[in-house]
A protein has these predicted regions:
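Short, positively charged and aromatic/hydrophobic N-terminal segments
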Residues: 3, 7-16
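N-terminal-proximal low-complexity accessory segments that begin disordered
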Residues: 18-56
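Glycine-rich phosphate-binding loop of ATP-grasp-fold ATP-dependent ligases
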Residues: 156, 175-205, 232, 254-272
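Phosphate-binding site of ATP-dependent enzymes
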Residues: 173, 202-256, 305, 309-324, ...
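ATP-dependent carboxylate/phosphate-activation module, predominantly the ATP-grasp catalytic core
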Residues: 235-290, 325-326, 330, 345-368
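Flexible, glycine/charged-enriched surface loops at secondary-structure junctions
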Residues: 296-306, 368-375
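Peripheral (often C-terminal) accessory segments that flank ATP-dependent C-N-forming ligase machineries
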Residues: 323-329, 334, 363-402
Length: 402
């Protein structure tokens, strides 16, 4: 008995349809750099459970790739019944069958990597619709922490010898050592000079460094800052231009993403004012555009983000920019600094999702939402499945998001 393929509601308009894909294992796939890569179970389950979320930013008539159509429809209805009529959910077997007779306009994944290209080739996506291997290699290069260290960061060194790693840790006292490519806190190690004096677990760490250098070519080493607040700026490359899309106020637990504030851009700027001025944020934003636009204009189209940090600024924190007051003066009254680039995410981010979700809720909700009510967007795991949830409330000083 053959597979039954229902007629798609938008089949007559496939020439203008886009295929949307949520592939959150992207960062791990970049590290592996293989045509066929199998993500860990947690990554595969996250992709399956939240496969519906491109519906939040998709355009009318777009296809969204999912494992289970009924499951996706049930999940997305919690964010508005209109989403089920806006997009068409489609499984891999259905897509493979469809591509025998129809053409898509374009493909828009969470992030582009060699593994995803191989997956789409096997489904029958024409080569002309996919990035070349040369372009993917360049995207991978710009996605690396080595590239960020060279182009957007201060006080971050790319190191290819374990002895130099030890020198920098002794210089900084406390440091963060990172693999060039990793995901959700994996490939990130915190170490202090005290570990050398007490022996501690340093031999294990040294083996980890040697392994990263062997497999990925090197590691980055940077000072460990005393974090006050995580935040990010979200952008999109469109027609060769880097466009600012908004602030992302997010939180992490054990270096893994846990949630985002859902509110207007004006409210987010207001929340940040006790920590950093709007003018200084604008200056940082412009510097990022000036660096990223020429780097990406010929190789990448789509969303990207830059993670940042507000920290306490001590005398030794020479690489942390002083936070300026509202008049743009460095009076050193706050004792705060800003690290304007912790990571570059050359893909869609949960910050983009939060911006899109807020816009959708405002456009399709009651007057209460439109009067600047703040909510929190969370990704939660209940022991069985991952869930995207909206919870009422706003961050506080004691608990920014949790």
């Amino acid at each position: 008995m053959g597979i039954f393929f229902p007629i798609l509601r938008f089949s007559l308009y496939l020439c203008t349809m886009k295929l949307r894909i949520f592939n959150p294992e992207h960062d791990l796939a970049l590290a592996a750099n293989l045509k066929q890569f199998t993500a860990p179970h947690a990554g595969r389950q996250l992709r399956s459970d939240l496969a519906f979320i491109p519906a939040l930013w998709a355009e009318e008539g777009d296809l969204v790739l999912v494992d289970d159509i009924d499951f996706a429809k049930n999940r997305v209805r919690h964010f508005g019944a209109e989403l089920n009529s806006k997009v068409e959910f489609i499984t891999k077997p259905q897509l493979k069958h469809l591509l025998k007779t129809e053409f898509l306009d374009s493909v828009h994944p969470w992030g582009w990597n060699l593994s995803l290209k191989g997956e789409l080739e096997r489904l029958g996506i024409p080569e002309i619709m996919l990035p070349t291997d040369a372009v993917l290699n360049k995207v991978r290069e710009v996605s690396s922490r080595q590239w960020a260290a060279l182009h957007l960061q201060r006080g971050v060194e790319y190191v290819t010898e374990t002895a130099r790693v030890k020198e920098l840790i002794l210089q900084y006292g406390k440091a963060v050592v990172k693999a060039p490519w990793s995901s959700s806190g994996r490939g990130v190690k915190y170490v202090s000079a005290e570990d050398f004096r007490t022996a501690g677990d340093y031999p294990t760490f040294e083996r980890w460094v040697a392994n990263m250098i062997y497999h990925q070519g090197g590691v980055t080493v940077e000072p460990l800052y005393n974090k006050v607040r995580d935040f990010a700026m979200e952008f999109e490359m469109k027609d060769g231009k880097a466009l600012y899309r908004g602030l992302s106020l997010f939180d992490t637990i054990k270096n893994a993403y846990s949630g985002n504030v859902l509110c207007s851009e004006a409210e987010k700027v207001e929340m940040m004012k006790p920590l950093i001025s709007e003018a200084q944020l604008a200056g940082i934003r412009q510097r990022i555009i000036e660096v990223m636009e020429p780097a990406l204009k010929d190789i990448y189209s789509g969303p990207f983000g830059v993670d940042m940090m507000i920290c306490t600024k001590g005398e030794k924190d020479e690489f942390c920019e002083a936070v300026l007051n509202q008049e743009g003066e460095d009076v050193n009254r706050t004792g705060l600094g800003v690290v304007p680039c912790i990571e570059i995410n050359l893909r869609r981010t949960m910050g983009h999702v939060a911006i899109n979700l807020y816009e959708h809720l405002v456009a399709n909700s009651s007057d209460e939402m439109k009067t600047n009510r703040t909510n929190i967007m969370r990704v939660e795991y209940d022991g069985n499945r991952y869930h995207l949830r909206i919870k009422p409330g706003r961050p506080s000083e004691e608990a920014p998001l949790h």
